[in-house]
A protein has these predicted regions:
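Conserved catalytic segments around the Walker B and adjacent sensor/switch elements
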Residues: 42-56
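Structural recognition of the conserved hydrophobic beta-strand(s) that form the central parallel beta-sheet
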Residues: 90, 115-121, 142
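A cross-kingdom feature that marks ATP-driven nucleic-acid transaction machinery
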Residues: 14-22, 29, 38-45, 272-452
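Conserved lysine of the Walker
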Residues: 32
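Short glycine-rich substrate-engagement loop in P-loop NTPases that contacts/grips substrate
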Residues: 53-85
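Interdomain hinge/linker elements that couple catalytic modules in large macromolecular machines
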Residues: 153-336, 343-346, 353-361
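Short regulatory helix/loop adjacent to the ATP-binding pocket of P-loop NTPases
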Residues: 124-140, 153-156
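N-terminal pre-Walker A segment at the start of P-loop NTPase domains
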Residues: 1-15
Length: 452
């Protein structure tokens, strides 16, 4: 069991005045249960209830009062109700009993002294059906696959992890850190895979873990959807959709399958609710407001880059490749950057963004946009040295921003670039391993100088 940076948020939540029950939102196998058990070591009493177990679900399914429910929970755990002891109650797989979801409001209203965390692996797909969380009585935290920093921590490299977080990796360690980031691209961030690699350092052995996790995702299809046609479409996506990671897709023509656009679209949206993937729709203007154009083709980003590489058989090629731009036209590098950008926030509902211009005689696409204060910052992922940034330049011609970012394999550098009819902007070339901490860079390294 290795530490996760998200445990810092759990500590902040526990110390907060007016604390509400916390609902962990995240895909299957991102480490929700393990994180809570790690956090539980900081409490006097820990009660864990997995509602997939019938006897635990029955505690909530009866029509007893909340006081009787609470008494039953403590009785079953064989621990006394002692208000002098810090007690953490963990309700896992809460989606298995809707009444358990409703009980969260009473924990907030009647027993705010108790620390309550709920989680469920299929929570997202079921949210749109029969489960409704009590409004204003719970708060949420998103949990994603391990970030590069957490990967380093799992390998026992805490000092290097701190340097990556602080944007302070010494120049002498640049190549070494880049090599570790490539390992992270291959292994990915699913905790069970990371733990296996940290223990054995074996790329072959982690394949067995990937295969087991993938089988679990596929076996859950019947839980994701009830209609046979939608189940078939979901199975097809889980079998073949990984090869389109980082690509813009069209439902009507997805991998030349026989599924109708509506069926493919519904299947993708169902998988999106489970947080196994995200359909990222483009921004078409270079300024606020942020309004993704749902009429345009979305970009497909999967939960984990390591899983993508395993399914499509790219691990060996990536291992011996010096430039990620050579693989999939750079899609793998772009995909792992997207994963790092999402992992940088624990706020649920964060959406990644990219920009396109689809004019008849002028097409362009910037890999990502991030919001920093009142600014919309473009990011291009171009790991090679001799690469053009035509799309980024087109974005900056339409934008009033003074800063653009390029993530690459090289060292930290910057260029001042002229633009027609306006003042120049600064292009910062940033090592790709800093992808999850760009807000730190923008705040600490640029500050008022760039945005003044």
């Amino acid at each position: 069991m290795f530490s996760r940076t998200s445990i810092k948020y759990l500590r902040q939540w526990a110390a907060k005045e007016g604390r509400k029950p916390l609902v962990l939102r995240g895909a299957r196998q991102v480490g929700k249960t393990t994180l809570v058990r790690l956090f539980a070591q900081e409490f006097d009493t820990f009660i864990s209830l997995n509602l997939e177990e019938k006897e635990n679900a029955e505690l909530f399914s009866s029509d007893n009062s909340f006081e009787d429910l609470l008494a039953a929970i403590f009785f079953k755990a064989n621990v006394p109700q002692d208000s002098t002891r810090r007690t953490l109650i963990f309700i896992d797989e809460i989606q298995c009993e809707p009444k358990a979801v409703q009980s969260l409001r009473y924990f907030y209203e009647k027993r705010p002294d108790l620390y309550v965390i709920a989680a469920g692996s299929l929570l997202e797909s079921l949210m749109g059906r029969h489960i409704s969380f009590p409004v204003g009585r719970v708060e949420y935290m998103a949990l994603h696959p391990c970030t590069f920093v957490e990967f380093l921590m799992a390998l026992g490299m805490d000092e290097l992890a701190r340097q990556v977080e602080d944007f302070s990796v010494p120049a002498s360690l640049h190549t070494y850190t880049l090599g570790l980031f490539k390992k992270y691209m291959i292994v990915g961030g699913l905790p069970e895979v990371v733990s296996c690699f940290a223990q054995y350092g074996d790329y072959v052995r982690i394949g067995d873990v990937f295969n087991s996790l993938l089988s679990g995702y596929r076996d859950d299809v019947e839980k994701y959807a009830s209609k046979p046609k939608e189940q078939d479409a979901i199975r097809y996506i889980l079998n073949y959709g990984w090869a389109f990671a980082g690509h813009r897709i069209q439902f009507a023509k997805f991998t030349n399958s026989d599924f109708k656009a509506a069926d493919a679209g519904n299947a993708f949206r169902t998988l999106e609710k489970t947080l196994l993937l995200e359909l990222v729709y483009p921004q078409v203007t270079a300024s606020f407001p942020i309004l993704p154009d749902l009429r345009k083709s979305p970009k497909l980003l999967w939960l984990d880059t390591g899983m993508v590489n395993y399914v499509v058989g790219m691990q060996e090629e990536l291992l011996f490749c010096n430039d990620a731009d050579e693989l999939w036209n750079g899609d793998i590098a772009e995909h792992v950057v997207g994963q790092e950008l999402l992992g940088a926030s624990l706020a649920f509902g964060e959406k990644r963004m990219f920009w396109v211009r689809d004019a008849k005689n002028s097409q362009a696409e910037v890999d990502f946009l991030i919001r920093f204060r009142a600014h919309l910052i473009p990011i291009e992922v171009k790991t090679g040295v001799n690469t053009r940034l035509r799309s980024l330049h087109q974005f900056m011609e339409e934008s009033k921003e003074k800063v653009a970012l390029r993530l690459w394999n090289g060292p930290m550098t910057s260029d001042t670039i002229a633009r027609s009819g306006g003042e120049p902007f600064t292009l910062y070339n940033i090592p790709i391993y800093y992808a999850g901490h760009l807000h730190v860079f923008l705040q600490r390294k640029i500050g008022g100088m760039a945005f003044g």
